[in-house]
Amino acid sequence: MFYPRPYLSASQLATFKKSKKDYFKTYLLGEFYGNKYTEFGQWVHAELEKPESTEIIEIVRTAIPHYTDRELDILTNLDGVPLKGYIDLVNKEQGIIADIKTSKNEFTQKKADTLEQITFYNVLAELYLGWTPKKNYIHWLETAEDENGQLYLTGHSKTIETKRTKKQIDDLKKEIPLIWQQIGEACDKELDKIINNTI
């Protein structure tokens, strides 16, 4: 079977489950180019990694607790399925993982509790780090637009703790191999359509 990426990520999983059409456009055809919001989020992550930065980034840093690891790049395997993910923040001593989100609209508890990305990261932590996170956090950073449409951080932030049960983690671990199989089969069919339409 053909896979657009040699691994499964949280974003792939979410996109495929939401819309196969969007998955094909994004990962098979490469038609997703991002937007100013995703680009701004990437910029914030990059700025937080620098030893020195702007005043607003320093304000943000003070709002986020200390973590032993930042931008932890994980590549692991679950029942033959290669999994990849970037966990923004990890505190190994306290068993904590966290993700940074930027948006104009405030991140809610409900959204945090239903975000499958966090469950996926719990799976990665179990497989790669060897432990199940005791706590999961979302660090939300508020953004706004100036008169020219440029995004900036307001300095307002919010930290949300969200829990994941063993059942939620185990259910996703059971689902991942099934979704991986479905992705391969769906991509094979889509490629056949593309090839037949070009003949």
Task: Name each model-derived stretch.
Residues 1-92:
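Metal-dependent nuclease catalytic cores that hydrolyze phosphodiester bonds in DNA/RNA
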Residues 7-8, 79, 126-199:
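Metal-dependent nuclease catalytic regions and adjoining charged, substrate-binding loops involved
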Residues 21-28, 98-102, 152-158:
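Short acidic (Asp/Glu) and glycine-rich catalytic loops that position anionic groups and cofactors
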Residues 26, 46, 96, 120-127:
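Residue-level signal for well-ordered alpha-helical scaffold segments within enzymatic catalytic domains
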Residues 29, 52, 102, 126-130, ...:
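Hydrophobic/aromatic-lined pockets within catalytic cores
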Residues 30, 103-105, 142-145:
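Short, solvent-exposed loop/turn segments at secondary-structure junctions
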Residues 32, 36, 108-113, 164:
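Conserved aromatic-histidine-acidic binding/catalytic patches
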Residues 75-118, 123:
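Non-catalytic protein-protein interaction segments used by genome-maintenance enzymes to assemble
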